[in-house]
Amino acid sequence: MNILDKIDAASLRDDVPAFRAGDTLDVHVKVIEGTTTRTQLFKGVVIRRQGGGIRETFTVRKVSFGIGVERTFPVHSPNIEKIEVIRRGDVRRAKLYYLRELRGKAARIKEKR
């Protein structure tokens, strides 16, 4: 192991649940506004997970008031308080970019049995 791997290993989180593209998540994000700190919930479908190690990220998509919102989070960020898996989705792709074009019921993902 070289020096960078040792530094990265010290920053890795161990409380990250197993999730993949198609799963519905609750991401609890720490938001700092001035002197106050609060937790903001972002709930949506994982459309991609990429990278590895300390640089690993995932993108969550939700529809808010009829507008699609996507947010990319680093998996090991200290600003993420916790990640909860709500539903396991049954998909055959690793990147679900096609969901951007779908509307309404067509954008739903089957639940894994």
Swiss-Prot record:
Origin: domain of life: Bacteria
Coiled-coil regions listed in the entry: none
UniProt entry tagged with the keyword Aminoacyl-tRNA synthetase: no
Key words of the record: Ribonucleoprotein, Ribosomal protein
GO CC annotations, alphabetized: cytosolic large ribosomal subunit
Molecular function GO terms recorded: structural constituent of ribosome
Record-level GO BP terms: translation
Entry's family note: Belongs to the bacterial ribosomal protein bL19 family.
Record's function text: This protein is located at the 30S-50S ribosomal subunit interface and may play a role in the structure and function of the aminoacyl-tRNA binding site.
Name under which the protein is recorded: Large ribosomal subunit protein bL19
Protein species of origin: Corynebacterium glutamicum (strain ATCC 13032 / DSM 20300 / JCM 1318 / BCRC 11384 / CCUG 27702 / LMG 3730 / NBRC 12168 / NCIMB 10025 / NRRL B-2784 / 534)
